Amino acid sequence: FLPFLGISQSGKVMDNLSVVSKILGMERKYAVYLPPDYYTSERSYPVLYLLHGAGDDHTGWVQFGEVLQITDKAIADGKSTPMIIIMPDADTKVRGYFNSPDNAWKYEDFFFDELIPEVEKKFRIKASKRFRAVAGLSMGGGGSFMYALHRPDMFSAACPLSAYTGPLSMEAFKAQLANRSMAGTEAQLEAY
């Protein structure tokens, strides 16, 4: 008599992928989590865009957030549907998920116009609002909050965790920009 040996499938994480951005004029890295049945099925999956906090990069959720173990367990326990998770880098060259007020740095444009179309073509992602969510921590929480506000047509759910949403006054905003060596005209700052 041999005892039953339960062997569960594991998802896969690739943390050194990249997309060439014409908008940013550089290559941007990202990580992806693929569910356990990705390579044994032909189905398409919902997607979660998972944004890291300040001082981290696209590998943060992989290394410190244990995205592979936590997501595999949630799927195995029936608490989550199998999904693809995309974790983009927002800490190389300029930190943040937004366009700069003077539009010299257009990360938000890159995210919506280049990253999303690229990964939704590369992986079997259900490319519609109904199957797309965004979440993030701290700086990434701010990104997920603002992306949901700026583009409600894109996401069915948003989960900003301890979201940093920026300064509370125009004076504090200008001081923050000065500390980051960024600038903008009064009209650009007001519009931003």
Where are the language model's segments positioned?
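Bacterial Sec-dependent N-terminal signal peptides
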Residues: 1-11
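Non-catalytic cap/lid and distal C-terminal segments of serine-dependent acyl enzymes
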Residues: 9-192
